[in-house]
């Protein structure tokens, strides 16, 4: 077995953390790129046996140093904020490109990047030209994907996870902004079907790709753990919680008034375009998946 480590970005967050844990469970060494090794989150992953290296995705030289000797890189970026409080999607692209180019300069043979469902395909939709709130986000994700495809790695894989099951946690104040008693709040329509994904399944998919680079070479996996409508989701949550819930059927204005975060408006695109991820895509590759009801019973029951 290759004893070289995998450089994991975002290891103190959700997707990177899930990937680090999945790799460790497979006896694959993990090196995490962190900006500050003295934070509680960094210390927590170090306690699992993760090697910490200090760097910044805006500093390509630090990326090259961090990637030296790695067998693979796991890549995830989220936009920061500009000085006026807007999402910094240009910065997200810059980080992704720096990581790709830094890994190439360091001679890393494999690159596994997690993006988002439907990124790139959105440009082909007949209604895309109407303008949608999710436009800049999908544009940033697509730009990083395009750069990876032509970067020249010996092996590369794109993971395109769907709608996080974790968005249903009341602590997120996202789909339950008023708590469970306040019901589901969203612009998603009752018949809209979501390609749901549990965050640990993203880690499992990344670890599977890293363990078998040749099999996953060039794979662009639309990753879903389950594919359910909002009505079906409400039925599952009702069973688990023992509280009757109905799928919302709200306008954007009504949803915002009920507490939906502004970024929830981006979900209007899902009502129009749907989500391409299906569980069978991952199952065909041997990736273990988490059913939504099982997830809900573990986290909400």
Annotate each predicted stretch with a short phrase:
Residues 2-44, 58-61, 65-72, 78-93, ...:
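Oxidoreductase cofactor-interface core, primarily capturing Rossmann-like NAD(P)-dependent enzymes
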Residues 22, 216-217, 240-241, 252-301:
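A hydrophobic C-terminal alpha-helical subdomain
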Residues 49-50, 156:
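Short, conserved active-site loop motifs that form the nucleotide-linked donor/cofactor pocket
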Residues 55:
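Cofactor-binding loops of NAD(P)H-dependent oxidoreductases
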């Amino acid at each position: 077995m290759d004893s070289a480590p995998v450089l994991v970005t975002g290891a103190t967050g959700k997707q990177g953390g899930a990937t680090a844990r999945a790799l460790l469970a497979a006896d694959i060494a993990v090196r995490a790129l962190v900006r500050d090794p003295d934070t509680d989150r960094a210390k927590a992953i170090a306690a699992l046996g993760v090697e910490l290296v200090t760097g910044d995705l805006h500093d390509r030289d630090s990326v090259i140093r961090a990637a030296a000797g790695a067998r693979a890189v796991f890549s995830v970026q989220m936009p920061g904020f500009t000085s006026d409080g807007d999402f910094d999607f240009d910065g997200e692209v810059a980080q992704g490109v720096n990581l790709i180019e830094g890994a190439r300069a360091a001679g890393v043979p494999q690159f596994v990047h997690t993006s988002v469902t439907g990124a790139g395909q959105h440009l082909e939709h007949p209604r895309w030209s109407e303008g949608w709130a999710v436009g800049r986000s999908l544009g940033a994700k697509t730009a990083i994907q395009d750069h990876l495809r032509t970067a020249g790695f010996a092996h590369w894989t794109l993971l395109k996870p769907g709608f996080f099951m974790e968005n249903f946690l009341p602590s997120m104040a996202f789909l339950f902004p008023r708590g469970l008693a306040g019901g589901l709040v969203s612009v998603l329509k009752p018949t809209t079907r979501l390609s749901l994904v549990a965050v640990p399944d993203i880690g499992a998919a990344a670890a599977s790709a890293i363990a078998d680079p040749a099999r996953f070479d060039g794979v662009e996996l639309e990753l879903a753990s389950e594919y359910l409508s909002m009505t079906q989701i409400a039925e599952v949550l009702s069973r688990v919680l023992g509280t009757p819930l109905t799928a919302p059927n709200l306008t954007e204005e009504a949803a915002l008034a009920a507490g939906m975060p502004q970024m929830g408006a981006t979900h209007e695109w899902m009502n129009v375009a749907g989500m391409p991820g299906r569980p069978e895509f991952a199952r065909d590759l041997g990736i273990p998946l988490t059913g939504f009801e099982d997830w809900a019973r573990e986290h909400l029951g």
